[in-house]
């Protein structure tokens, strides 16, 4: 039985007309276009207006990200040949292109028949489109704003040597902390932990990660010195001394992990270690540390799932 009112179809009408969709989901989708459970033309028009504003905001945020990139690229142009600078610019350009690729979905056709509020199936389809469009606009705003912030931080890093050195020192801190943790793990193998072979394999993999990160820091240290030389900025020599210490400690950890290895462990995990080595070989400075960590997580052995 139809529950159509002078204003339009009711939520119950739409639930009855649409098969295979949970009624609560339908009700939630229709909320923006209903008034007291009835679809109205005024509510639809208001929803279109609000959604259009969201879409305009999203495109504006993308334009601001484009402006931020262009400004940063102009500032970086004299030193863009330095890997630490050029690679960051390339990454931002790719991210900007990814954000710009969202623009077509920010331009949906939101026009509707004048009597759509009386058509239950079309009202539902329109409500789905609105939900998807609002979600796409929100995602685009978030992505564009995050990118703009990252680009502004890069520009500040580029223009302020202290910010560059502070960021490098923070990276050194992270690697030193990781070395501390790894040394403690190695000290507990093979007698102080359960599943020592798995602990050893994980430690061996983490050692490879630290070696890659130390090499990445060495490459960035060279780039920071070139930047300082070109801009006549003072250079923090103590950063190089700390990096020397990090490289020495990584070498010691590599030696220690090899010394405690049972030959059977090496044989058992040879393929896993080789697979990680192959993946890490594809990374070149400047390295995205998050991607390296994801590579490690993908290869770490799990004693709870492997046959023992």
Task: Write out the residue ranges for each language-model feature.
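Leu/Val/Ala/Ile-rich N-terminal alpha-helices, chiefly Sec-type signal peptides and the beginnings
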Residues: 1-146, 300, 304
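Generic, low-specificity signal for short hydrophobic/alpha-helical stretches with a mild N-terminal bias
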Residues: 33, 37-40, 74, 81, ...
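Long amphipathic alpha-helical segments with strong coiled-coil/leucine-zipper propensity
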Residues: 91, 95-228
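Long amphipathic all-alpha helical oligomerization modules
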Residues: 169-308
């Amino acid at each position: 039985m139809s529950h159509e009112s002078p204003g339009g179809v009711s939520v119950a009408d739409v639930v009855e007309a649409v098969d295979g969709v949970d009624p609560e989901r339908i009700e939630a989708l229709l909320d923006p276009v209903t008034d007291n459970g009835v679809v109205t033309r005024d509510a639809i028009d208001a929803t279109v207006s609000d959604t259009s504003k969201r879409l305009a905001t999203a495109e504006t945020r993308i334009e601001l990200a484009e402006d931020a990139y262009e400004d940063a690229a102009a500032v970086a142009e004299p030193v863009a040949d330095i890997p630490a600078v050029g690679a960051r610019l390339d990454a931002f350009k790719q991210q900007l292109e990814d954000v710009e690729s969202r623009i077509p979905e920010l331009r949906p056709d939101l026009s509707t028949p004048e009597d759509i509020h009386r058509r239950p199936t079309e009202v539902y389809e329109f409500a789905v489109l609105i939900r998807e469009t609002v979600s796409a606009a929100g995602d685009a705003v978030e992505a564009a704003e995050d990118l703009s912030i990252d680009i502004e931080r890069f520009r500040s890093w580029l223009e302020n040597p202290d910010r560059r050195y502070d960021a490098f020192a923070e990276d050194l801190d992270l690697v030193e902390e990781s070395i501390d943790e790894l040394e403690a793990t190695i000290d507990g193998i093979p007698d102080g932990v359960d599943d020592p072979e798995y602990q050893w394999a994980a430690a061996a993999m983490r050692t490879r990660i630290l070696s890659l990160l130390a090499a990445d820091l060495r490459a960035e240290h060279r780039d920071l010195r070139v930047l300082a030389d070109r801009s006549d900025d003072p250079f923090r020599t103590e950063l190089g001394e700390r990096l020397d210490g990090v490289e020495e400690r990584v070498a010691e950890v590599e030696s220690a992990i090899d010394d405690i290895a049972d030959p059977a462990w090496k044989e058992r995990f040879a393929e896993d270690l080789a697979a990680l080595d192959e993946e890490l070989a594809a990374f070149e400075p400047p390295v995205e540390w998050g991607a390296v960590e994801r590579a490690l997580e993908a290869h770490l052995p799990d004693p709870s799932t492997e046959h023992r």
